[in-house]
Amino acid sequence: MPRFFLVLLAVSQFAFTQTFTYKAINIPGATETQVRGVNSSGEIVGFYKTTSCVETNIQFPNCPVHGFKITNGVITKLLVPHSTWTDIMGVNDFGDLVGFAITTNTGAHGFLWKHQNVITYFNTPEAGPNSDIHTVAMSVNKALVVGGADWFFSDNAPVNGWVWANGMFGTMNPGGTVSGTCCWGVNGISNNGFLSGQNFYQDFDSAWFKSGTDEDFYLFNSRDTVGTGVDSNGDIIGYSTTGKGWFAKSIEANEGTNDATEVKPKFISVAFPNAKATYPFGLSDKRMIGGTYVDSNGGIHGFVATPNF
């Protein structure tokens, strides 16, 4: 039975003594760079813009972008074949990529781009190449299980969450049997099957964590909150919609063996130095974070953060 649990957190619960070391990521010549994933080998992925365009939502770009990966300091710019638009949203430890693309010959799709350079396109039943609903792959683990969501370009939240594996979709809508829930999204999947994401529940956008049949929902500082990456330790990352990033260690392990007792996770601030807003998106099993920050002038940049703990 799913359990619905909101943790209302005060800023004082942040563990400010445990910090990260940050590095900015900017693609030369780009007007904007966003990092969306990092794996245990340190491979960094994301997307960039070459023209000015204002986004509706930081999670899913409604402006044309090109993908990239950085391996051992070498930048490789990426476009799905025949595409005018390629979002690289996630990477696993083998270097397999997932994201969203619009192609000139077959329209809009989610995709899995294997490191052997084989690309698989897919769309949920609700979406399609010419639909206003778009299939956006957000994350992938080593077993090639993909987590994602359906999105409209104009919306501030996803429509429907899902996982995809071996050509088959499974709906992963937390709280689907509870009145008042909507706007689900699966934003992170770990190598051992933990899921992280978001939904709208009890008047708030809530971060969501799933381990087996257990589902937990979290708010940071009583504000709308998005859960993004998750690793095999059960660590999670995310942000409030005001741009306050956070990391929480091993939240299921903190509960002990009694699943009826919830323990409030201890949150660590994720804040790029002097940034107006910080958005952590991807998390590796080595607790490296890939994300995006907004500078004091409104410029958008990528970053990676390495834990000092």
PLM region spans:
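N-terminal signal peptide c-region/cleavage motif recognized by signal peptidases
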Residues: 12-14
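Sec-dependent signal peptide recognition
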Residues: 2-8
